[in-house]
Amino acid sequence: MSYSQKIILIDNVNKTPVPDVTVYGKFSNKSLISNKNGLIDLKQFDKNDTLVFGHVSYNSIEIIKGAIFEGSKLYLIPITHELSEIILSVARNKESKEKISKQVSLITSKDLKLDLPQTSADLLTYASGIRVQKSQGGGGSPAIRGFEANRVLLVIDGVRMNNAIYRSGHLQNSITVNPNSLERTEIIYGPSSVGYGSDALGGVVHFYTKTPKINNNNKWNSNGISSYNVRLNNIIQNLDFEYSAKKWASYTNISFSKFGDIIMGGERKHGFDDWGLDNHYLDSDKFNDSKITNDNPKTQLNTAYEQYDFMQKFNFLLSESSNMIINLQHSNSSDINRFDKLNEIKNGNYKYSEWYYGPQKRTMISALFNFSKKKKLSDKSKLLFAYQKIAESRHSRRFQELSKINQIENLNVFSINNDYFKNYSNNSSLVYGFEYTFNNVNSKAFLQNYNLSESGMAESNQFYNIPTRYPSEEGHYSTAAAYYEFRKDISKQSNFNIGMRFTNTMLKAKWNDDNIINANISDVHSKNSSITSSLGYVFRSKNNWKISTNFSSGFRSPNIDDIGKIREQNGILSVPNAELKPEYAYNTELGLSKFSIDKQNMFSINAYYTHISKHITRDYFEITDDRSTSDKSTIIFNYEEVITMANVNKGNAYIYGASLGFKLKFPDLWLIKGDLTYTEGGSVDNDLPLPSISPFFGKFSFRYIINKSSDFELSYKFSSSKDPDKYSIGGEDGLEETPIVFDGIDFTYSGMPSWSVVKLSSSYKFSNRFKTLIVLDNIFDIHYREFASGISAPGRNLNLVLSYKF
């Protein structure tokens, strides 16, 4: 006969029940999860079984069941200080943050307690040192340490999101990850090619979605989030469903988002009265003869869009030492207008009547096998198979023209990752593994004519082939790699790590005769190999100082976008360059951290210097066999004379910078946090500016916990200005999007003005089932733009959020 033995799990700080605590019997291999009230019944465990109580936000506890009495309260100590955080992404294995020599950041649901990011791009701004660029409503391109787009690696659940057509300008692919499906997001700063391979120059952003937990007791959990932005007319509806059983578990996430046109701020502290105002617009459904007046110029028309996301995860227990996780994700958006393009002026008129991205679709299915049975060569291992299907397109029609350019890209990406983990008795560990990826790119392009009648425009059946954005006949890109990382505890206070990775990349691109811009290129084969390494050391003093130093190298092998893209912007045409080679980054950094005795307060500073060899950048490029114009630097493209540029290896470059962060917690539940970021960079050979070098920026927040049910936060973020002579010549940073000034001789661009905004957030918990959140952003209605952005940020706006369980 078995008797009930119920206990309650309590937070040791705020004395509230802790739900979702996993209890695992070491000898019985049985497991349970505490309910929403922190209650759990231990009757199924033998009295001599050793129970392990674990939760991602609390320190684990081991205790023999016989020492626990009916009705006991077990107090869990929260993981509240930086040194005790567990990081999953560095070296693709769990590691205590106190032993990591690189700068890392972690974003969890607790960090978002007083806010609801609209997209995963917005989510990344909560980490220190990350700037997000936008050119349209459905955008968000993160920049880390002066690197952006395909120089920052995005990963979701262990699968690379970067693919063969990730470009070097700005990307919006991060918005295809639903922020409400995430359990945690980790950011590794600086070159991280040992663990992740090509593209990880500026750093790695690793999204971890929620995983369902297996439970001996059948259990349902259902949660919802409803959000409405009063001024911007944004609506977000998110639903979670989780089911746990003895042998399997399921997690389902469904989300729909509808974003209205972005309304900019009205207070122009920068002094430019007309900058960014959307005074006129065109009706894209009509053959435009003239501009239409916008009754509210602060409303940036054509920035609205919609998106829905779906995720399904299954967790199957295969044996006592293995499980399988099936992961299905799908994201789909509406058409997304390119706001900066629709406001491009040429000869006094709008250049485009239409310019939009077609629906951006990302589908992923993966199977992850975890094995925890100890063997001679490993204690644990993981095997991950993944397939991704990506679809994107671009559509544009020039002002007063009856033909539309359509460029359509489809990708199929296959990948395999195999990772092994081995702990040794001499306080050392080894992580090693293998990776293979294959990208197949299908690129199409055509011109479609419209018929004009009294009732308006109508699509015709007239289609004409035009040059594709990427190789039209064939586009393949593959990587194969092997890596290892060894870690050793020298003493209780110090440790070091050393790692190495060998990567081989292969690219094949082929154009058909109708799509050749450069007649010297019709078939390109490229093969590159690279060895990258990392070396780190950490020292932790007895008085809570941490000193870390790290050397790491990274590389980026040219992908199909780098070598074979054809793209026109502002009269400049990007053309293919078959001679492009990989670029390399060599990074040295030093970190210093100080923690209080109770670990509640911290201060940290990280400084780094990155040397870039064979830097890939855009430069003027002559197509020697072109005779369409007398000027060797231009060609005729789409009936217009344009300047030709290409990606080239432009010698050596450098980036250096520093970041500072602090956290102060007071006994009466006041919490103050802040971080500052400084970056500089240029070319070693001619000291020309590099793209994506952000001006000095930072943020501060002041939080007060009123009681167990309510708290509020006041936050402040800012950015200094950037002068026009510090913008890159390739145009990646959008100097033309900055204010125009008269310098006494001519009209010139002034560069990006400085700005600062304040936000107020407050939450109230009605019960364990209902919670409200109110966010008043940009309180003083300041007009500003993020650096390199082609769209103004929202002005004062109020967001209302309701979270509920059912």
Model-inferred region functions:
Residues I68-Y75, S120-L123, G140-A143, L154-V155, ...:
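N-terminal periplasmic accessory domains that precede
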Residues L232-F259, M264, K269-S334, K361-T363, ...:
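Transmembrane beta-barrel wall of Gram-negative outer-membrane proteins
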Residues T22-K26, G54-Y58, F69-K113, A149:
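Short, acidic, small-residue-rich periplasmic hinge/interaction motif at the N-terminus
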Residues S334, K389-S393, N504-N515, H525, ...:
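Surface-exposed extracellular loop regions of Gram-negative outer-membrane beta-barrel proteins
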Residues S491-K492, N504-T505, Y608-H611, T629-S728:
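Gram-negative outer-membrane beta-barrel transporters
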Residues K43, M161-P191:
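Short acidic/polar hinge/loop motifs at secondary-structure boundaries
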